[in-house]
């Protein structure tokens, strides 16, 4: 897939070195956690209340686009509660026994983090229901007429589920979460603080305007901001004095073909296809997928969310439509053959 080559993709697989760096700069407490003020305030109250009662925190669902800190927040929850974190992902839990092994190894009030929880198989998901509600594990012993069910008591624990596709969760599973938090794209100010903090932890010399320039091109996503910081660091070492200032950041990011609003070649290709090939739309997902030679899931989950959030495209019942902002960004003339309704939509 094309998106795996994108430096600004929050889904891009990371190298071992990058994972080590990310763990080193990852905030450990809510006090270090920048951005998401509503989430931070709520979680601080919920965690303090649970600790005062000496209870496990309510099961927590965290959802939002990739790279916004769902895994980071799960680690913070465990750290703030003073308990262990056991981590896995939906696709890894293929059999009921896989989940049973994890659950039976939990200590009191521990946190079990399941990433991509929407990808749990139905068999595994059914095991979770009594575990979440009653802290009990139902296991079938034997087969056929001799089969019998036994119940194993579990210690109180907190399940933290993370997903980019909250709509794919079944209602019975979603309803069992006592706390549901949505992570939003970060503001430029919050991202610049994250970039500045990461630079200091990596012993990099960075100016305020250098951090701000990286933040502006990071698509509201901390994972992308930290990745761009590492690439700008490389550029500063080779082409500059090692100091990350505005000029160095601008030159490095331009070399990486990340434009001033954070768009890369894939965003440009998507928007130009929509505006030049299809006169601004409306265009259906199947048509865009064929025109771009890209998977529908990648278009919906990776390319479009930021474009929609920033107001460059609209999803309507008839398909995707380029907005006036998109035409202005590329300095393109709005086609004369657009319908009156579409002209009105573009002007909103």
UniProtKB/Swiss-Prot annotation:
Subcellular location: Cytoplasm
Start and end residues of each stretch annotated as Small ATPAse domain (RuvB-S): 187-257
Catalytic activity, as annotated: ATP + H2O = ADP + phosphate + H(+)
GO BP term (any one): DNA recombination
Region (Large ATPase domain (RuvB-L)): 4-186
Highest taxon in the source lineage: Bacteria
GO terms for MF: ATP binding; ATP hydrolysis activity; four-way junction DNA binding; four-way junction helicase activity
Residues holding DNA: 315, 320
Entries under CDD domains matching the protein: AAA
Record protein name field: Holliday junction branch migration complex subunit RuvB
């Amino acid at each position: 897939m094309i998106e795996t080559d994108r430096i600004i993709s929050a889904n891009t697989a990371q190298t071992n070195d990058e994972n080590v760096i990310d763990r080193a700069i990852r905030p450990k407490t809510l006090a270090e956690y920048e951005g998401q003020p509503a989430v931070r305030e709520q979680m601080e109250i919920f965690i303090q209340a649970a600790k005062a009662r000496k209870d496990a925190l309510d099961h927590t669902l965290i959802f939002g686009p990739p790279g916004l800190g769902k895994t980071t927040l799960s680690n913070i929850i465990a750290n703030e509660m003073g308990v262990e974190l056991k981590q896995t992902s939906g696709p890894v839990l293929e059999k009921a026994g896989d989940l049973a092994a994890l659950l039976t190894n939990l200590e009191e009030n521990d946190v079990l983090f399941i990433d991509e929880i929407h990808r749990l198989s139905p068999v595994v998901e059914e095991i979770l229901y009594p575990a979440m509600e009653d802290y009990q594990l139902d296991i079938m012993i034997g087969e056929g007429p001799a089969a019998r069910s036994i119940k194993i008591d579990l210690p109180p624990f907190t399940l933290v589920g993370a997903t980019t596709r909250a709509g794919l969760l079944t209602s019975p599973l979603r309803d069992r979460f006592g706390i549901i938090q949505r992570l939003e794209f970060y503001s430029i100010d919050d991202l610049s603080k994250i970039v500045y903090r990461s630079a200091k932890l990596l012993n990099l010399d960075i100016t305020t305007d250098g951090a701000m320039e990286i933040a502006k091109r990071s698509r509201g996503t901390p994972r992308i901001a930290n990745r761009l910081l590492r690439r700008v660091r490389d550029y500063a070492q080779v082409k500059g004095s090692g100091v990350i200032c505005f000029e160095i950041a601008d030159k490095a990011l331009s070399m990486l073909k990340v434009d001033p609003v954070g768009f890369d070649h894939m965003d440009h290709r998507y928007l130009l296809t929509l505006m030049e090939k299809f006169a601004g739309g409306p265009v259906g997902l199947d048509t865009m997928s064929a025109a771009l030679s890209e998977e529908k899931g990648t278009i919906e989950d990776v390319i479009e969310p930021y474009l929609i959030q920033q107001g460059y495209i609209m999803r309507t019942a008839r398909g995707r439509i380029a907005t006036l902002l998109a035409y202005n960004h590329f300095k393109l003339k709005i086609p004369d053959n657009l319908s009156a309704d579409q002209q009105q939509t573009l002007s909103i």
